[in-house]
């Protein structure tokens, strides 16, 4: 696991071989075939350029972009993956999955800085390799890392406060990718 210390206290833990390829392939197929995928409207009413699914503890709701994402119950596969990531860092009660069907599916520059969310996010990539790009809010400093089949990134420290991240579109002919972002959602008081 490589530790990348970022400006203003952001931390990235990066392991491009967190899962062996055969296990990553198995997880990819199970999640692709059995998750409750949906495409939701995003900002300004346009459909999000990816499919999403939400899983977690009973009663957990993650609100972003003005939409409530109610967690479905954990699947055995997601619990198995969650335990592997928690062994590295963090405790998680929610997982937002993003399914990128081609290079045209993307996630724009954003920070996961909602007040009800903890500051540690475990992000596992399965399937095709894409570019994970980060940008500092003030200095505009950037960095890109390849996220391929079995890559784990842990975003921690002040990452969400001072940095934004994205999965940009690509014209390259890439296959499908599933990204799992494990989070700790604080229940409302």
Language model: regions and residue ranges:
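Non-heme Fe(II) oxygenase metal-center motifs and adjacent flexible, charged/small-residue loops
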Residues: 1-189
């Amino acid at each position: 696991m490589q530790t990348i210390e970022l400006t203003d206290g952001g931390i990235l833990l990066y392991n491009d071989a967190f899962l062996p390829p055969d296990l990553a392939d198995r997880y990819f197929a199970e999640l692709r075939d059995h998750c409750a995928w949906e495409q939701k409207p995003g900002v300004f009413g346009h459909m999000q350029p990816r499919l999403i699914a939400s899983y977690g503890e009973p009663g957990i709701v993650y609100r972003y972009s003005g939409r409530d994402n109610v967690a479905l119950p954990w699947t055995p596969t997601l619990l198995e993956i969650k335990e592997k990531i928690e062994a590295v860092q963090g405790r998680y009660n929610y997982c937002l999955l993003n399914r990128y069907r081609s290079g045209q599916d993307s996630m724009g520059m954003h920070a996961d800085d909602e007040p009800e969310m903890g500051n540690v996010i475990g992000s596992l990539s399965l399937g095709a390799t894409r570019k994970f790009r980060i940008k500092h809010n003030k200095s505009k400093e950037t960095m890109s890392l390849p996220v391929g089949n079995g890559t784990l990134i842990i975003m921690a420290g002040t990452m969400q406060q001072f940095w934004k991240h994205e999965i940009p579109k690509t014209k390259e002919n890439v296959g499908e990718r599933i990204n799992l972002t494990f989070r700790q959602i604080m229940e409302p008081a």
